[in-house]
């Protein structure tokens, strides 16, 4: 099950108490203090785990506590330090304070390990409190308490390219054809219920990661449909690929305008992202001359509209994922766009 948001409770370990002890040996009647220090409590760390892309394991285990430090012993023996807790999260997980929603750390690189809570300091044994006025101190420090925090884990998948489109326009077919991703593909809306990542091998030396999210509908920024819940997963992408469908009721230009507006309402940053456009299902030539005329007319209308808006870096490509036409050209265009885009994580 895909889970991209969960809250958990974390606590570091308490420091161990210092010992009150006196040296006891044969022929030494009044030995001095020899109480050891308590061990420090364990810390709480968060670490990127590249072997997972979901927070589902946290649904059943929401409390994480490091071990307490052990008390000090005689003969100045220090107590054992408490074991740390290491919480492993997917790449792209943000750690926030649950109450204030303030960002604590963004786990956006791998490898990466960050200490969230330090364990309590162990108490000093009575050895430290001997002085001229008190040769046999009977006092030792208690260990300091650990820290506690209620945190929110928010996963934002990291990809180079984010697919954007209405439901059932061919996004899942496209990503499954280009990459190793295997989303469900069927002829009904909202086939894609969760985000999918796929690695596209562009050539012998280059590859990029593509993200497919559930389809967006008009009004998504206000909570309609499924796409709004997953738009955060394309916020980190360096490039957006709009998938438009000539078979829809809206024209190609209208589709792009609706999708762009929903992205801008969700995050103004997304509206500034470099993008390209693919026209899916361009293999429907068997529908006759009327379809071909409609396709050419709407494509020209979209090109003129984008030219007026001043988007020189964008491209428009007709493709067919079923017949695999236009896909090599698409990968080439995406690769070029990523290479000139500083936000890319191109490998």
From Swiss-Prot:
Predominant cellular place of this UniProt entry's protein: cytoplasm
Domain OBG-type G: 159-339
Cellular component annotations (GO), alphabetically ordered: cytoplasm
Binding site for GTP: 165-172, 190-194, 212-215, 280-283, 320-322
Places the protein is found: Cytoplasm
Gene Ontology process terms (BP): ribosome biogenesis
Keywords, comma-separated and alphabetical: Cytoplasm, GTP-binding, Hydrolase, Magnesium, Metal-binding, Nucleotide-binding
Gene3D superfamilies in the cross-refs: GTP1/OBG domain (2.70.210.12), P-loop containing nucleotide triphosphate hydrolases (3.40.50.300)
Cofactor entry: Mg(2+)
Ranges where the Obg domain occurs: 1-158
Chain positions recorded as Mg(2+) binding sites: 172, 192
Pfam families: GTP1_OBG (PF01018), MMR_HSR1 (PF01926)
GO MF annotation, one: magnesium ion binding
Catalytic activity, EC: 3.6.5.-
Assembly behavior: Monomer.
Biological role stated in the UniProt entry: An essential GTPase which binds GTP, GDP and possibly (p)ppGpp with moderate affinity, with high nucleotide exchange rates and a fairly low GTP hydrolysis rate. Plays a role in control of the cell cycle, stress response, ribosome biogenesis and in those bacteria that undergo differentiation, in morphogenesis control.
Family: Belongs to the TRAFAC class OBG-HflX-like GTPase superfamily. OBG GTPase family.
Protein name per its UniProtKB record: GTPase Obg
Species whose genome carries this gene: Helicobacter hepaticus (strain ATCC 51449 / 3B1)
Gene that encodes it: obg
